[in-house]
Amino acid sequence: MSWQAYVDDHLMCEIEGTNNHLTAAAILGVDGSVWAQSANFPQFKPDEISAVVKEFDEAGTLAPTGLHLGGTKYMVIQSEAGQVIRGKKGPGGICVKKTGQALIFGIYDEPVTPGQCNMIVERLGDYLIEQGL
């Protein structure tokens, strides 16, 4: 399965029991290289991804400044070192899951809930971790 298929079929899929889906999603290498992304994933800066990677190494580094992606600032509401970062901006937010080699991004807006976004992103992340990725 191609990385683009993972984004299209597992991240941008319809959420069970609803007609809703994430606003944008992507799979990036921990070096910031894009493996696959949805058409509307924000154009990000390399230093924004570097800051996310640093947060996974040292949880709490993004708390004072927020998580920035494509110029949008998300307030970090939860961060587990080496695992997951969750952020909020108004009625929407972001979830980033780290695997051994990748960062999985999911961005949502209402009516999608934080829990639905977390479930989609983390389910794929856990699967990739099981596959050694």
Curated annotation (Swiss-Prot):
InterPro entries on file: PFN, PFN_euk, PFN_sf, Profilin_CS
Keyword set includes Cytoplasm: yes
Disulfide bonds: C95-C117
Record carries keyword Disulfide bond: yes
Cellular compartments annotated: Cytoplasm, Cytoskeleton
Family: Belongs to the profilin family.
Role: Binds to actin and affects the structure of the cytoskeleton. At high concentrations, profilin prevents the polymerization of actin, whereas it enhances it at low concentrations.
Entry protein name: Profilin Sal k 4.0301
Upper lineage: Eukaryota, Viridiplantae, Streptophyta, Embryophyta, Tracheophyta
